[in-house]
Each structure stands twice: as C-alpha cells, then as structure tokens.
C-alpha cells in the first residue's frame, strides 16, 4: 500500500483528493493537515466523506508526515510547497504539488506571475505532471508539478495540431470555468448573488496560467507559441470548457482532423475524441478524470476551432495528481480514477 499525506486537506482540491484516494485500492491515507480545522475529523468538515474517511485533521507537522508517508500531496497556496518538497526529497519521499511552485522551467517566470515567492528550485529535480506528454519522466520523478486546470484543457486540446505542424503559433483561447476554480475562501466574486445567472470575464490577457500554457505549447511546437487568453467565470460548480481558435497552415477538412486526433490519443484512456459534429460539454465529464475534445473547421476564415471539456477539480487538479501518483509508484494508471461521469 502507498502511504499518503495531504497538506491542505480541506480546500476543494484537498477534499477531492480524499474523495478519490478513499476508494483507491492501493492507498492508505496516513496524514491530513489543515490550519483551519485541525483536531476535527475531516468527515465533520465534509459530511460527504462519512464512513469513507473519518481521519482527524492535524496541524502542519513535517516530521510526523514524513515519518509515515511514501508520498505527500501539497494542496497549498503558491510559495508553500518548496519547503515541504526539500525536506521530503532528503528523506526519499515523493511530492506532488497541486500549486504552481514546480510548473515552470524558469523560476524567474514564476516570480513574475505569482505572489508567493520562495528561493527557487535549488537543485530539486521536478517534472511537469501532464502524463500525456511526460509519462516516462513522471515514472522516475521525485517532485511533480501538477498542471493548472486551464493549461490542462488547452494543452490537451492543441497538442495533436502543434505536433503535426497544422496550425500557426498564435492562438486565441476562450475558457469558461465553474466557481469551484476560485477556491473555498469567500470573496465577492464567488458569492451566490454575483455568480448566479451571470457569466463574466476576469484577468483578461493577464491570467497567471498564460505563461504555463505558452511554455508547454512552445516545447510541443518547437517554436514560440503565443496565447491570447480570456477566462470566464460561469454559473456552475465544476467544469472547464475551453474554445481555441487556430489559423490553419493548409486546407484541411474536419474528417482529417478527427483522424489526426483519434490516432494521436488512441492509447490515452482519459482522452475522448468526439466524432465530427459532436461538441464537448462540461456535464459529460462531471466528477471524472476524462477530457473530451471536439472541433470544427471554418473554411471561410481558414480557422480550426477546437473545444475541450474537463472537470476542473479532477483532470484539472486532484484526479490528474492521483494519475501522476499511480505512474510514480508503478500502479495501473486508471486505478481509483475509472469513474463514470455524473449525468445529468
């Protein structure tokens, strides 16, 4: 059994980790930390976990966590995971960070876009945790930087096109996210009266997931990729629907595009390529680790429109983190994640 600890267990990504791991046949949850709810059972904070995980939440205790765990998930604000990772690596414990601390190849880019500063990677070997690209590297990794939710939806949607040189490197992305993406801390923007029957753009052209997208897309393309990104908050709890507008380098029809995607992702269980004329919907992936991808060719403007849907808390966060854990420990990748989406 893989012994697991979670720092930041009571945020949305933390509790989603517990939901998935509590039914994982190869995992034992040994340690859960929370600054806000320590000494309280997690099932008294989230009654959905009653009988599945009733473990008592504890204060942050590095030594205890590392004496009992094989892997630690950090579901903390940016800037807090590096210290934990350093101590864990010394003791041979693996770390999967759901924040942004280990997503960037260049630490200066992290400092430019994120407020939580720390003293760099300092020799920590980290891997960007998108299995569909870095599976072999993840197998050997000690520290994995779990991708952001928006970048996951965008990179998976665009990767076959960039790999095959079908589109140009200037891409427009429009994404809609459920309010759980804003986290559990209360704010005016995620109040019911502000979100209900309302959809609004935010952080236009300056969202901090932009450099993460550009970093990974550029590596796939072999040239610089620039992304014009507009995220929106939609009146739903979960889900991301990303629409990507790409200029074609040559004439291509939608059936050929389908064949390219179907071949590219034929071995990827969690990627579902929809047939021409069918488009992704967030409800079709709700509560699951799947990514649905669809597309359309606008011949009039020589534009390929790609759409992808994920659950922001699962494939966009905690599910992908568990997928990475499975790979790191040689466990079948689907274990604990072979969940049929909830519909309606």
From Swiss-Prot:
Gene3D superfamilies according to UniProt: Dihydrodipicolinate Reductase, domain 2 (3.30.360.10), NAD(P)-binding Rossmann-like Domain (3.40.50.720)
SMART domains: Semialdhyde_dh
SUPFAM superfamilies: Glyceraldehyde-3-phosphate dehydrogenase-like, C-terminal domain (SSF55347), NAD(P)-binding Rossmann-fold domains (SSF51735)
List of catalytic residues: 149
Keywords: Amino-acid biosynthesis, Arginine biosynthesis, Cytoplasm, NADP, Oxidoreductase
Subcellular localization, as worded in the UniProt entry: Cytoplasm
EC number(s) stated in the UniProt entry for this protein: 1.2.1.38
Domain of life: Bacteria
Cross-referenced CDD domains: AGPR_1_C, AGPR_1_N
Family per record: Belongs to the NAGSA dehydrogenase family. Type 1 subfamily.
NCBIfam families attached to this UniProt entry: argC
The name this protein goes by in its record: N-acetyl-gamma-glutamyl-phosphate reductase
Organism annotation: Thermoanaerobacter sp. (strain X514)
Organism placement in taxonomy: Bacteria, Bacillati, Bacillota, Clostridia, Thermoanaerobacterales
């Amino acid at each position: 059994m893989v012994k697991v600890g979670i720092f930041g267990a009571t945020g949305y990504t933390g509790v989603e980790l517990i939901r998935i791991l509590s039914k994982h046949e190869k995992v034992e949850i040994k340690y859960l930390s929370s600054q806000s709810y320590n000494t309280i059972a997690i099932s008294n904070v989230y009654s959905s976990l009653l009988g599945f995980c009733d473990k008592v939440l504890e204060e942050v205790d590095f030594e205890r966590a590392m004496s009992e765990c094989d892997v630690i998930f950090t579901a903390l604000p940016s800037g807090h995971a590096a210290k934990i990772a350093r101590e864990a690596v010394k003791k041979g414990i693996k770390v999967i960070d759901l924040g942004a601390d280990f997503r960037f190849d260049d630490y200066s880019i992290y400092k430019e876009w994120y407020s939580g500063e720390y003293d760099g990677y300092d020799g920590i070997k980290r891997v960007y945790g998108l299995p569909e690209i870095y599976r072999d590297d993840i197998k050997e990794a000690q520290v994995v930087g779990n991708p952001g939710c928006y970048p996951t939806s965008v990179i998976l949607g665009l990767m076959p096109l960039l790999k095959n040189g079908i589109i140009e490197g200037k891409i427009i992305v429009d994404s809609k996210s459920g309010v759980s993406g804003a986290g559990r801390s209360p704010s005016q923007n995620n109040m019911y009266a502000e979100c209900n029957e309302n959809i609004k753009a935010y952080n236009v052209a300056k969202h901090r997931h932009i450099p993460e997208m550009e970093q990974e897309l550029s590596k796939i393309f072999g040239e610089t990729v620039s992304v014009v990104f507009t995220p929106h908050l939609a009146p739903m709890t979960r889900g991301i629907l990303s629409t990507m507008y790409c200029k074609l380098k040559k004439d291509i029809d939608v059936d050929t595009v389908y064949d390219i995607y179907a071949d590219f992702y034929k071995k990827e269980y969690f990627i579902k390529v929809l047939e021409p004329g069918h488009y992704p919907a967030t409800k079709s992936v709700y509560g699951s680790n799947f990514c649905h991808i669809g597309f359309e060719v606008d011949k009039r403007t020589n534009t390929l429109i790609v759409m992808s849907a994920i659950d922001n808390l699962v494939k966009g966060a905690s599910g992908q983190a568990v997928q990475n854990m499975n790979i790191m420990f040689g466990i079948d990748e689907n274990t604990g994640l072979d969940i049929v989406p909830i519909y309606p």
